[in-house]
């Protein structure tokens, strides 16, 4: 059974004779094909909108844990891409018990409704495959069963989801601009206690572009000092209680200001 397909499609065939015949027909139509074995071994460098997987009788490889083919198919599909599983079940392989012995003996044979049994058998197969598809990230998994000349065909369709909404996709570099905000770039200066004993005050005073010390005059001459609150230059009304500039008039940002150590107690 050859399926009408759209562009950007890959056909995967299991290693069996009926699938080999289909492979030749698809090659005549210039449709890319690959065997299940090669698909699992080779590395593909492109993604497809549609992947069809044909298998005849044998479908147990669909739930092999190691190198799971459904997982690789999902990785090779574009978002919202479609996986189509075409599984042919031979009529003789669908085990259909048609006899049960009556417990009352007398060798009475009871016919079992073969149609109902086949439906249950097919439903069990579909449930197992659906579970494997869900485990590997597929959604919207449906099955359409059709009757062939000597068997039954399961046409299982699954979709590779695109969980990113339009709003999520609209996330742009604007978020990075938030981190480039000038307010975030303000240099943070840790304040030092007046009676510092840990040595932090000494390190701060000796670091370059911080404070110049004039021990003879008992004065601090500030140079390029960055205020921790940013309000020191505005005047006492805007200064905190422990501000070293307390009592000094307002000054221009970046202006050198002398602090008299002798008046520190005042």
Swiss-Prot record:
Name this protein carries in UniProt: Anamorsin homolog
Motif Cx2C motif 2: positions: 240-243
Domain comment in the entry: The C-terminal domain binds 2 Fe-S clusters but is otherwise mostly in an intrinsically disordered conformation. The N-terminal domain has structural similarity with S-adenosyl-L-methionine-dependent methyltransferases, but does not bind S-adenosyl-L-methionine. It is required for correct assembly of the 2 Fe-S clusters.
GO molecular function per UniProt: 2 iron, 2 sulfur cluster binding; 4 iron, 4 sulfur cluster binding; electron transfer activity; metal ion binding
Database matches in HAMAP family: Anamorsin
Protein keywords: 4Fe-4S, Cytoplasm, Iron, Iron-sulfur, Metal-binding, Mitochondrion
Location of the region described as Linker in the Swiss-Prot/TrEMBL record: 165-185
Region ranges (Fe-S binding site B): 229-243
Family (UniProt): Belongs to the anamorsin family.
Localization per record: Cytoplasm; Mitochondrion intermembrane space
Family annotation (Pfam families): CIAPIN1 (PF05093)
Cx2C motif 1 (motif): residue ranges: 229-232
Region called N-terminal SAM-like domain, residue ranges: 1-164
Residues noted as binding [4Fe-4S] cluster in the record, renumbered to the chain: 229, 232, 240, 243
Subunit structure as annotated in this protein's UniProt entry: Monomer.
Keyword Cell inner membrane: no
Swiss-Prot/TrEMBL GO biological process terms: iron-sulfur cluster assembly
Main location: cytoplasm
């Amino acid at each position: 059974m050859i399926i009408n397909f759209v562009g950007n499609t890959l056909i995967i065939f299991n290693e069996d004779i009926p699938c080999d015949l289909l492979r030749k027909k698809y090659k005549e139509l210039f449709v890319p094909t690959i065997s299940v074995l090669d698909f699992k071994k080779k590395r593909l460098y492109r993604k497809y909108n549609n992947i069809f997987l044909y298998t005849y009788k044998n479908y147990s490889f669909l739930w092999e844990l190691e190198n799971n083919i459904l997982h690789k198919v999902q990785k090779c599909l574009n978002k919202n891409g479609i996986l189509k599983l075409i599984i042919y079940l031979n009529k003789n392989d669908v085990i259909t018990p048609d006899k049960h012995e009556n417990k009352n003996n007398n060798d009475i044979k009871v016919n079992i409704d073969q149609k109902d049994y086949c439906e249950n058998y097919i439903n069990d197969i579909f449930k197992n495959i659906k579970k494997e598809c869900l485990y590997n990230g597929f959604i919207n998994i449906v099955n359409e069963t059709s009757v062939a000349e000597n068997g039954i065909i399961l046409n299982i369709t699954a979709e590779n989801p695109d969980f990113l909404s339009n709003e999520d996709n609209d996330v742009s570099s604007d978020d990075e601009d938030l981190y480039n905000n000038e307010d975030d770039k303000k240099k943070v200066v840790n304040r030092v206690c007046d009676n510092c004993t840990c040595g932090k005050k000494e390190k701060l005073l000796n670091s370059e572009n911080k404070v110049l010390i004039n021990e003879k005059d008992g004065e601090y001459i500030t140079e390029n000092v960055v205020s921790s609150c940013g309000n020191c230059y505005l005047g006492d009304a805007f200064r905190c209680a422990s501000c070293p500039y307390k009592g000094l008039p307002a000054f221009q940002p970046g202006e050198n200001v002398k602090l008299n150590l002798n008046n520190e107690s005042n």
